[in-house]
From Swiss-Prot:
Its main location: mitochondrion. The keyword Lipid metabolism does not apply. This is Probable mitochondrial import receptor subunit TOM40-2. The gene is TOM40-2. InterPro entries: Porin_dom_sf, Porin_Euk/Tom40, Tom40. The keyword Acetylation applies. Pfam families: Porin_3 (PF01459). Forms part of the preprotein translocase complex of the outer mitochondrial membrane (TOM complex) which consists of at least 6 different proteins (TOM5, TOM6, TOM7, TOM20, TOM22/TOM9 and TOM40). Present in a large lipid-enriched complex called mitochondrial transmembrane lipoprotein (MTL) complex made of proteins located in the two mitochondrial membranes, including the TOM complex and the core components of the MICOS complex and containing at least digalactosyldiacylglycerol (DGDG). Binds to MIC60. The lineage of its organism: Eukaryota, Viridiplantae, Streptophyta, Embryophyta, Tracheophyta. One of its GO terms (molecular function) is protein transmembrane transporter activity. It comes from Arabidopsis thaliana (Mouse-ear cress). It is a multi-pass membrane protein. It is found in: Mitochondrion outer membrane.
Amino acid sequence: MEGFSPPINTAQVDAKTKLDEKVDYSNLPCPVLYEELNREATMALKPELFEGFRLDYNKSLNQKFFLSHSILMGPTEVPNPTPSSEIIKIPTANYDFGAGFIDPKLYLIGRITTDGRLNARAKFDLTDNFSVKANALLTDEEDKSQGHLVIDYKGSDYRTQLQLGNNSVYAANYIQHVTPHLSLGGEAFWLGQQLMSGVGYAARYETDKTVASGQIASTGVAVMNYVHKVSEKLSFATDFIYNYLSRDVTASVGYDLITRQSRLRGKVDSNGVVAAYLEEQLPIGLRFLLSAEVDHVKKDYKFGFGVNAF
């Protein structure tokens, strides 16, 4: 009839909208580093747990230079000389001193401990796309010193790395966005000391609310992670690790809760391990830390508390 228009088919409108929203494959985003594919799950499921008392003090001397002091007092696990599965711990205390220089194109960070360990890291951005990173660990223990060099190149929608280490360690990886949400990558490595080589493959899918990633390597390990962001303050994470050579399986689930003055992370895994980590911001320039881990199978219990001053 005149004056009436035909009803609108919403399905046809949605289909037309999707066709109109064509993907510009020449303008895809740059992916995360290959080694950081699981960073969201790692942050939620693997906080820096500790046992005993920990005190950290960081002092900025100017906008680029800072000093740090750290004290850790608590038990340390040592190998059991008997066939018993009992865990042996001895009381220890350790202090480390650190210094750092941070610039938009260069950072240098070094730490030395009372047990004779020197840890140094450096990164230099040669251009906006090309950077070099170096890590070194020096110790008086035989065959424990390490050196690692990473050359990183970042393209518009891809990243690639070349890694060189002592003991004839060579590795290379490449990752690229193939759609606005999906990135695919692979790696190859050679371990000269173990006379072992291998390859690996990875995929990562991310949206505003979810991140899913998976990796598999010829060494026999497959890893899958999923993180769901419920709100700006709360997210849940889970991971699944399977070694198809030894048939070992580990699964874990956890959460990450961020409030105005605190952050609480916790997890439980299929090995019977329950852990929690709390960071509480105090109004006087201090951060209070609580760390707890319970291994019901091994009957191992760890508790720690600390203070971070800045």
